[in-house]
Design a protein with these regions (language model features):
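Glycine-rich phosphate/pyrophosphate-binding beta-alpha loops
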Residues: 177-180, 256-261
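A generic structural signal for short
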Residues: 12-13, 69-70, 146-150, 191, ...
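Generic "edge-of-domain/loop-turn" microfeature
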Residues: 57, 196-198, 259
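N-terminal Rossmann-like NAD(P) cofactor-binding subdomain of oxidoreductases
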Residues: 1-135, 171, 235-236, 240-245, ...
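A glycine-rich, Thr/Ser-enriched phosphate-binding loop motif common to dinucleotide/cofactor-binding enzymes
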Residues: 66-77, 150-159, 164, 262-266
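C-terminal substrate-binding/catalytic lobe of Rossmann-fold NAD(P)-dependent oxidoreductases
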Residues: 1-6, 93-98, 102-251
């Protein structure tokens, strides 16, 4: 109902889908509540900030419509890592391939993956409802619908959202893949910077970066893996190495819990920032 239920509310977290967010935005904000929205409804609106606190927290203060948008999960964890490199040298280009867990499509999708594994191992026919194909023992190189340029909406979100968050002309080319992991998204990232960045520089920047944990010891087989990082708050970084084809290129691997940092935690961090800065 469109009533005065939000009168006296300082912060409202919304995570009920783009349609619901659009319908109720004015009702939620009309008495001064700050709406922190987890849907895609407002992310690319020019008068609504798109915020990852480790990267562009101050943008949250400029919200003429009383709304702050939470970015897409894959974008959030990527820009937290990119910020550390951007502080060393401007990033010109990013190529990223994502390995996105089943739970990124919702709890029912995660349940379907469980069911599919049981069915395959029992020799039964496989239930396919939440994905275009069987995900168990498979990879699906499509997340969301395809656009006219051959990229999916998920991939284009990474292009547009990254530029808005980082206030940059950075070019992003993404390939987003659904993988049969239960939770936490992984990303293989290649960046081209204006000047060469050494592995040592990058490692130090990641180690000091806000919201990042360095896990990069290949000799001991230590690197981020989704199996062990579900439920963790930070973005983990490893497999840091120089590109062999471009002296200004650097490659690394990140893993983050898309339900925590990729959604809920990021929204809470925005609220904490507003409270801390007395910016409500």
């Amino acid at each position: 109902q469109h009533n005065d239920d939000f009168k006296g509310v300082d912060i409202a977290f919304t995570s009920a889908g783009a349609g619901t967010s659009k319908e109720y935005a004015k009702t939620i904000t009309k008495h001064g509540a700050v709406m922190i929205d987890n849907s895609s409804a407002f992310r690319m609106d020019n008068d609504i900030p798109l915020v990852v606190p480790e990267v562009n927290a101050a943008d949250a203060k400029d919200r003429p419509r009383g709304i702050i948008a939470n970015p897409n999960c894959t974008t959030i964890q990527m820009v937290v890592a990119l910020k550390a490199i951007e502080q060393l040298s401007h990033i010109k280009t990013v190529h990223v391939s994502t390995y996105q867990a089943a739970s990124g499509a919702g709890a029912a999708a995660m349940d379907e993956l469980y069911t599919q594994y049981r069915q395959v191992l029992a020799g039964e026919s496989v239930t396919v409802e939440k994905f275009a194909y069987q995900l168990a023992f498979n990879l699906i190189p499509q997340i969301d619908v395809f656009t006219d340029n051959g990229y999916t909406k998920e991939e284009m979100k990474m292009f547009h959202e990254t530029r808005k968050i980082m206030h940059s002309d950075i070019k992003v080319s993404a390939t987003c893949v659904r993988v049969p992991a239960l939770r936490s998204h992984s990303e293989s990232i290649w960046v081209e910077t204006e000047r060469p960045i050494s592995v040592e520089e990058a490692r130090e920047a990641f180690a000091k970066g806000d919201g990042l944990v360095l896990q990069d010891n290949p000799a001991e087989k230590e690197y981020p893996m989704p199996l062990f990082l579900a439920g963790k708050d930070p973005v983990y970084v490893g497999r840091i190495r120089k590109d062999l084809t471009n002296e200004n290129g650097l490659t690394f691997w990140i893993v983050g819990d898309q339900i925590k940092k990729g959604a809920a935690l990021n929204a809470v961090q925005i609220a904490e920032y507003l409270i801390r800065e007395k910016a409500l």
